[in-house]
Amino acid sequence: MEQSNDGQTAHTLLHLASAEVESLKEGITFLRNKESGKNFIIYKNGEELRACKNLCKHQGGTFIKDIEDLGNRTVRCTKHNWKLDVSSMKYVNPPDSFCQDELVIENDDENGVSLVELSPPNPWDSDPRMAVCLEGGEVQVTYLTHACMDLKLGNKHMVFDPWLIGPAFARGWWLLHEPPCDWLERLCRADLIYISHMHSDHLSYPTLKKLSEKRPDIPIYVGKTERPVFWYLDKSGVKLTNINVVPFGIWQEVDENLRFMILMDGVHPEMDTCIIVEYKGNKILNTVDCTRPNGGKLPTNVALMMSDFAGGASGFPMTFSGGKFTEEWKSQFIKTERKKLLNYKAQLVKDLNPRIYCPFAGYFVEEHPSDKYIKETNLKNDAAELNMLIRNTSDVVTWTPKPGAILDLGRLLIDPTDKNGIIDPPPGTKIFKDSWDYDTYLSIHSFSFDDEIFHYPSWIKEYFTWAGFKGYNLVLRMIETDEHFVPLPKGYNYLVDFLDLSFPTERPERDHPYEEISSRATVIRHVVKHGLLWDDLYIGFQTRIQRNPDIYHHQFWNHFQIKLPLTPPDWKVFLDREKENNATLQNCSIM
């Protein structure tokens, strides 16, 4: 490893001797470093060499040869069939999405070649502090539910991602675990709250509404993402007055012993973040939902690491039908993907080697009776199974949390076998929820369904013009349905051609990709009325999707899930205009 004047380090990941370089064939060659176990891809075009890690940027899958590629330039990910053109380092399926991080090719005097990765300085290494031995009870971590942890750090309390009541993603996700009955008091006494990103299983407006009624000035910290985490706050009706947006990679000092640093995700930097909390030099790493937290560069040997583990946080493939999407195919895909994720998380923990690891942020359930199919199909990883896998291959101490359980960091760092290092809730404590108050939250969607704007079919043009997505060759059919995805007899059923943002009555004659989305009418109308992101539809299992060809349209979904305008459509102006137009037409007919 070499270090430059600017602090950047160069890591040699693989070296090829002269004979190995000469044996490289034109096009793609797959290589493996037997010592590290890491895989790489080299592309040769005459004298030119390009190289990258064999790691899909989407969700960390492995590339294999693309049998459909006759030019020997493209590889296919075994996870979601994403395709990478290694000659350009651009992903071609989906088109116009990511570029692959390229490795540096270095030639030596003996005609050998090294694959080198350049890395900037680790931000957490700035102003380093030696870890001080912690007393028992000095640092305690209490699991509340899902991704919500209550951290006692000396005389300070910090809370992560409070989702304690209500659903997430419209009505698709419900809490699996029953939070401790004093959860609101815990939130109110916190000195600070960290919210990792805008998804509603982390930023829960129903939860924050309860908190704001008692303590609106509580300090909340979020990362400076492209789309603000609290973009919807003004429209939510929740009054919070102390939201702090902080830059990435810079220590935020709380007191002389406590500081934290927020880092961005490498795959979704526009919205996802993770955090390092440091108390007296002891680091707690919480990667939350990040696919490649900090681009895959993370601190090793931390005191405590937390991460997601479960899978199933997407409508794919459960909500898809047609073509290959048979029940057998979906079942096998889900089983395979969960196993891959389990192994990936186990390997990540092994590589980072924390003293203690806790899987969390995956304790949700599709509990509403109308989502019985999703609940039965969308099987998730078991935290205890992951922890067993980790213990079998490392010395890492693992924790499978229960609501109200307390991990005493000081005790476990001193003695991993200390029986008082983890205190489970008392016998008889309710662990799993058995009621969810559906009506309170679903009635909100019903109000939107009956809104006056939907009396005018021109709302369709108004909405998609507001959304601002066009110039893309995709034709979309939207179908409003009932609870069970049966089309409503009087519901809207319409086409949108995004190439010119038109609304034809029939599909155009030109070649075009086609996607058909059936959505529960109450939910899609709620999303439309309030200008919400389509995560409520897709991640919340509120759609059923067919597509031809079977291609993921990254630009389309990325726009509607992340890049919609920050303010909703001006429906008042719309209604005034429509009423005026109708009045004019009536006057003309009378005349």
Swiss-Prot record:
Subcellular locations according to the entry: Cytoplasm
An MF annotation (GO) of this entry: metal ion binding
Organism this protein belongs to: Xenopus laevis
Disulphide bridges, residue numbers: none
Protein name per Swiss-Prot or TrEMBL: Cytidine monophosphate-N-acetylneuraminic acid hydroxylase
Listed InterPro entries: CMP-Neu5Ac_hydroxylase_Rieske, Cnh, RibonucZ/Hydroxyglut_hydro, Rieske_2Fe-2S, Rieske_2Fe-2S_sf
Catalytic activity: CMP-N-acetyl-beta-neuraminate + 2 Fe(II)-[cytochrome b5] + O2 + 2 H(+) = CMP-N-glycoloyl-beta-neuraminate + 2 Fe(III)-[cytochrome b5] + H2O
GO biological process: CMP-N-acetylneuraminate metabolic process; N-acetylneuraminate metabolic process
Pfam families on file: Lactamase_B_3, Rieske
The entry's keywords: 2Fe-2S, Cytoplasm, Electron transport, Iron, Iron-sulfur, Metal-binding, Oxidoreductase, Transport
Free-text comment on the cofactor: Binds 1 [2Fe-2S] cluster per subunit.
Signal peptide limits: none
Cofactor(s) this protein requires: [2Fe-2S] cluster
Family, similarity comment: Belongs to the CMP-Neu5Ac hydroxylase family.
A Gene Ontology cellular-component term: cytoplasm
